[in-house]
Amino acid sequence: MRVSYDELKNEFKRVLLDRQLTEELAEECATAFTDTTQAGAYSHGINRFPRFIQQLEQGDIVPNAIPTKVLSLGSIEQWDAHQAIGNLTAKKMMDRAIELASQHGVGVIALRNANHWMRGGSYGWQAAEKGYIGICWTNALAVMPPWGAKECRIGTNPLIIAVPTTPITMVDMSCSMYSYGMLEVHRLAGRQTFVDAGFDDEGNLTRDPSIVEKNRRLLPMGFWKGSGLSIVLDMIATLLSNGESTVAVTEDKNDEYCVSQVFIAIEVDRLIDGKSKDEKLNRIMDYVKTAERSDPTQAVRLPGHEFTTILSDNQTNGIPVDERVWAKLKTL
């Protein structure tokens, strides 16, 4: 089924107002969730909303909290989110990183005591739309085994890198082959994952999303490489923010909150003139796109370029929503 932007936003806002959020905050939060869903990130938009409400009701999310600056070192700042709403706080932090980059050429914000930011790609895209390179990542609850282990000891720790091309080129990836949100998308669609997603109970690779959701044995992206990347991203976010690590969130909290995040903006126009920038970027993209296709019916993929098409389709034809997810939203 498909629903209109306003219909979806009104449902989000209704639920938020019922939880005593102010009119202004409910409007801002509902808009963020609707924008994410319309952009095609269903797993971190409407599908994630019930989980967001659960954490709101548990007190993990403090809706009226105001993030504060703790430390300033020129182009680097340290902030405390005080468990404010994750996606709204992340947007503010990338805005601040862009402000610093406009002054210093680069801006780095390290945030502690943050909540789940929903679609991390929104903040890289936010920077790239303004002509900046945007980089951000977050640590998370331990929901993935490190390479060589069965037990979950590392986070999926999503990493986003966005480049101001036309259209925007952006990598938005967890350190696992699939996030739990994308496993849910595949399960709801009644399909296997396109590549191996994790291990079954006997230690064999599997593409069955329901098995991996249940046993929590995600496959790290690139095997040991994704495992290693997750670990160092956690270390850096923890150090820069003076916040909680994956182990601290996992062992000291009763759910995923008080995570640590990093937002970086780079003003590339200080380093290269506009004409040269466009020529170099277009040459890279053209070189990639004109490679001989392995499947003649499938275009060579440039990361993030599909979102422009998805957004246009959803704006024209309505936003695709799984009927079961929609029914759940209506009961909240």
UniProtKB/Swiss-Prot annotation:
First-tier enzyme category under EC: oxidoreductase
Superkingdom in the source lineage: Bacteria
Active site: 44
Pfam families noted in UniProt: Ldh_2
Assembly: Homodimer.
Disulfide bridge partners, by residue number: none
EC numbers: 1.1.1.130
Protein name: 2,3-diketo-L-gulonate reductase
The UniProt record lists the keyword Lyase: no
Protein location: Cytoplasm
Family classification: Belongs to the LDH2/MDH2 oxidoreductase family. DlgD subfamily.
GO CC, one annotated term: cytoplasm
Keywords of the record: Cytoplasm, NAD, Oxidoreductase
Gene Ontology molecular functions: 3-dehydro-L-gulonate 2-dehydrogenase activity; NAD+ binding
InterPro entries linked to this entry: Diketo_gul_Rdtase, Mal/L-sulf/L-lact_DH-like_ah, Mal/L-sulf/L-lact_DH-like_NADP, Mal/L-sulfo/L-lacto_DH-like_sf, Malate/L-lactate_DH-like
Binding annotation for NAD(+): 168-174, 224-225, 304-306
Keyword Oxidoreductase recorded: yes
Function recorded in the entry: Catalyzes the reduction of 2,3-diketo-L-gulonate in the presence of NADH, to form 3-keto-L-gulonate.
Alphabetized SUPFAM superfamilies for the sequence: L-sulfolactate dehydrogenase-like (SSF89733)
Chemical reaction(s) catalysed: 3-dehydro-L-gulonate + NAD(+) = 2,3-dioxo-L-gulonate + NADH + H(+); 3-dehydro-L-gulonate + NADP(+) = 2,3-dioxo-L-gulonate + NADPH + H(+)
